[in-house]
Amino acid sequence: MDFQSCLYAIAEELGSEDLAALKFLCLDYIPHKKQETIEDAQKLFLRLREKGMLEEGNLSFLKELLFHISRWDLLVNFLDCNREEMVRELRDPDNAQISPYRVMLFKLSEEVSELELRSFKFLLNNEIPKCKLEDDLSLLEIFVEMEKRTMLAENNLETLKSICDQVNKSLLGKIEDYERSSTERRMSLEGREELPPSVLDEMSLKMAELCDSPREQDSESRTSDKVYQMKNKPRGYCLIINNHDFSKAREDITQLRKMKDRKGTDCDKEALSKTFKELHFEIVSYDDCTANEIHEILEGYQSADHKNKDCFICCILSHGDKGVVYGTDGKEASIYDLTSYFTGSKCPSLSGKPKIFFIQACQGSNFQKGVPDEAGFEQQNHTLEVDSSSHKNYIPDEADFLLGMATVKNCVSYRDPVNGTWYIQSLCQSLRERCPQGDDILSILTGVNYDVSNKDDRRNKGKQMPQPTFTLRKKLFFPP
């Protein structure tokens, strides 16, 4: 297919919502005034060609646009590219042609519900004329109106943050993530600018000598030196140990007579299975395991061949206490012992590869108390349950481990009998949203901390703060 036919075919596949998104992402190249006459994708492509952003043999800008609006089908069908390749490409900020600021605003618009959109309009009533805040006005159009009035800019996010703080705190978290990332990038660039040109030239020469081509250096060296390899499919095993029925524990152990079944845990199991399947892991699940059975399962995967795997994930959903999870028989399994099955000496085929454990269980019986927040937080009216009634090391003292705990030492974690646990549901949602954007796992877990910490147990005035512990040596990404 020739260049013009390719653009025509892509334009024919793009609907009105796609066009609105593309126009917003192109605002830094085509000002709003000049976009008013653009009524279809063909006209947009024509304007981009005039700007030199679309050229035969160079469709990188179009690929980036389609990637951000999630039209991965068009990347595959017309541009011989896929989502995973774009994630790798855009992981290097120097390759991005669309500003992170505009991408952040677009991603925010995708997260806002109809009710939240109405709240945005209400809170802007005094700043933007009512005639501009029409009923069918989208959030992207609201952002444009805010930019016109200098209420919103790359270096002026305070009004937007204030609104998001009132409407949906998770949106505020995304803005703060963007600000942190921008600060890190600016500091990196400033540090580079301080080097004399002669030093930079010498560095560039030495880098070029390390490989046959700059592209190889970008993809291969960066992968081997700074990023864990994630090329195999399946990436590895994802074990899910899902304990629901604790009737045996109640019968056999007097002290555990009040231990409840874990209603809602199947929601977590389903969410984890769906999420990690999308991330190319082989899902293996086990239901209602005793402590001994948990050990036996992990021993089995300790001796498995992980040679053609990049990673190992184990998710344990159960009751727990400080440093332990409970089997359905009420017996304890030490978290440290469970993670230690996968040290380099005990499981050589996983040596140098990331070993990840997500533990949804209480680590004590205390309720974390929250500081009153004027904005408040509405929690659904389901009855919340907890997953049980020294910080010993939970992971071996060697590299390449990550442990995501639902809560900190001595405290409970919360489970909604209808919707699952705060931690696992937030984790899965964040992975599904942010892995396609190229975010690394530690950044994602920081966002999970923010999300979960903003939830409330209104009955006990309790809060929850997840706790990641890790000995990772490199960045860890899960390309979709």
Curated annotation (Swiss-Prot):
Generation of the subunits requires association with the death-inducing signaling complex (DISC), whereas additional processing is likely due to the autocatalytic activity of the activated protease. GZMB and CASP10 can be involved in these processing events. (Microbial infection) Proteolytically cleaved by the cowpox virus CRMA death inhibitory protein. The modification N6-acetyllysine is found at K226. Changing C362A: Loss of kinase ativity. Knockin mice show embryonic lethality caused by endothelial cell necroptosis leading to cardiovascular defects. Keywords: Acetylation, Apoptosis, Cytoplasm, Hydrolase, Nucleus, Phosphoprotein, Protease, Repeat, Thiol protease, Zymogen. Residues 3-80, 101-177 form the DED domain. Coiled coil: none annotated. One of its GO terms (molecular function) is cysteine-type endopeptidase activator activity involved in apoptotic process. The modification Phosphotyrosine is found at Y336. It catalyses: Strict requirement for Asp at position P1 and has a preferred cleavage sequence of (Leu/Asp/Val)-Glu-Thr-Asp-|-(Gly/Ser/Ala). The keyword Repeat applies. Thiol protease that plays a key role in programmed cell death by acting as a molecular switch for apoptosis, necroptosis and pyroptosis, and is required to prevent tissue damage during embryonic development and adulthood. Initiator protease that induces extrinsic apoptosis by mediating cleavage and activation of effector caspases responsible for FAS/CD95-mediated and TNFRSF1A-induced cell death. Cleaves and activates effector caspases CASP3, CASP4, CASP6, CASP7, CASP9 and CASP10. Binding to the adapter molecule FADD recruits it to either receptor FAS/CD95 or TNFRSF1A. Belongs to the peptidase C14A family. Heterotetramer that consists of two anti-parallel arranged heterodimers, each one formed by a 18 kDa (p18) and a 10 kDa (p10) subunit. Component of the death-induced signaling complex (DISC) composed of cell surface receptor FAS/CD95 or TNFRSF1A, adapter protein FADD and the CASP8 protease; recruitment of CASP8 to the complex is required for processing of CASP8 into the p18 and p10 subunits. Component of the AIM2 PANoptosome complex, a multiprotein complex that drives inflammatory cell death (PANoptosis). Interacts with CFLAR and PEA15. This is Caspase-8. It comes from Mus musculus (Mouse).
